């Protein structure tokens, strides 16, 4: 009898152990199984029939669903949905109140998000922008400067201080803001109270450089220029594909990309910032390596020159970011910012380049920028001094 009790207890112990192991195995599989989430089904809109969705190669922060009779629904991650209503049509009755209506034809746009201007330029859409959140002196995109000089585009105040009276008098059909508007939500609320749709763009949150460029397709939907956008975007993807398919894509070369601020600190990109990724796509390796991950709200960081020296002095190439404090033309101008740079390998070997001030406004040409960086890393032509977005310091 005693023996049977012991056997029963042993069997129970084995059974419990087996069940525990099974549960652990199931949990483990659940945690590490790859995601099989399918794309969200298109929204059901009263009176409209879903037709198809826009094909996107790199962009992940927006989507576009097309419906019958030319209607299109734009969805921007964390920022809402926008129904683009064709000219001569009306928004369907019973439309979800959270969906913002944008009526075509779309004119007199108030463009506050500077990165979007070049995307409109690429699709020949600058004429649709009447109001700028940047003054003429702040634009490096020639078409925008020209439009402001002729009066076809006028300054209507920056994101936190718009000229409401001017915006209303000009019959603004849409305000396009960057996520900076979230620091002043009352501005967005007031624009919407005046009946002006507000679209907050998130191109800077794209994980792939060409994801930013692909936002031109979103703006093309607003203007009915999808074919133009497809062609312009393909030009950039073709350039990237050419670089990636090249025999010398794995250069093993290290690249430091930075600028020195007014107090002598070095401003560098974080490891997963899009500039760092462009360097990697071009066949290089970004340094310093331990600058942390970008949280999108802040894709750069400052470090003291001594720390930067220790981590980047052996970089094969230097690309100086001129966007903040102006372009450099000579090595001496660079060394005037810090004499420690004289000991850098890239300076000693004459491998120092500088960006043009238009680099960060021209978001449609990121494929070209990757091509430029690849050329820098692979060229054997010592006489090469000028590229599309970079020039060599002498």
Would you name each region that the model predicts?
Residues 72-76, 82-168, 174-180:
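A short, structured surface patch at a secondary-structure boundary
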């Amino acid at each position: 009898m005693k023996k049977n009790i012991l056997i029963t207890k042993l069997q129970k112990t084995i059974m419990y152990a087996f069940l525990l192991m099974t549960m652990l195995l199931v949990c483990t599989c659940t945690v590490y199984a790859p995601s099989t989430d399918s794309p969200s089904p298109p929204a059901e809109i009263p009176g409209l029939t879903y037709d198809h969705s826009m094909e996107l190669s790199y962009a992940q922060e927006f989507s576009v669903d097309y419906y019958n009779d030319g209607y299109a629904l734009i969805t921007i991650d964390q920022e809402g949905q926008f129904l683009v209503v064709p000219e001569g049509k009306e928004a369907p009755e019973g439309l979800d109140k959270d969906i913002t209506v944008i009526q075509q034809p779309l004119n007199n746009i108030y463009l506050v998000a500077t990165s979007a201007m070049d995307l409109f330029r690429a699709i020949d859409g600058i004429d649709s922008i009447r109001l700028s959140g940047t003054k003429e002196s702040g634009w490096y995109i020639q078409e925008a400067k020209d439009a402001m000089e002729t009066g076809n585009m006028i300054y209507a105040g920056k994101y936190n201080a718009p000229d409401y009276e001017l915006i209303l008098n000009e019959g603004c059909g849409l305000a396009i803001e960057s996520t900076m508007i979230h620091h002043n939500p009352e501005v967005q609320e007031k624009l919407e109270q005046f009946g002006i749709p507000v679209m907050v763009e998130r191109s800077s949150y794209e994980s792939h450089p060409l994801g930013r460029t692909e936002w031109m397709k979103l703006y093309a939907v607003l203007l009915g220029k999808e074919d133009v956008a497809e062609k312009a975007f393909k030009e950039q993807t073709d350039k990237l594909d050419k670089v990636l398919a090249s025999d010398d894509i794995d250069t093993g070369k290290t690249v430091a990309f930075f600028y020195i601020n007014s107090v002598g600190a070095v401003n560098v990109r974080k490891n997963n910032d899009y500039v760092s990724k462009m360097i990697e796509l071009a066949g290089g390796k970004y340094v310093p390596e331990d600058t942390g991950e970008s949280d999108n709200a802040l894709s750069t960081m400052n470090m003291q020159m001594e720390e930067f020296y220790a981590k980047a002095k052996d970089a094969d190439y230097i690309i100086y970011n001129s966007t903040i404090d102006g372009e450099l033309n000579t090595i001496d101008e660079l060394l005037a910012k810090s004499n420690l740079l004289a000991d850098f390998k890239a300076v000693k070997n004459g491998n120092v380049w500088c960006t043009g001030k238009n680099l960060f406004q021209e978001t449609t040409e990121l494929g070209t920028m990757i091509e430029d960086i690849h050329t820098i890393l692979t060229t054997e032509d010592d006489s090469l001094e000028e590229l599309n977005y970079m020039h060599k310091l002498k």
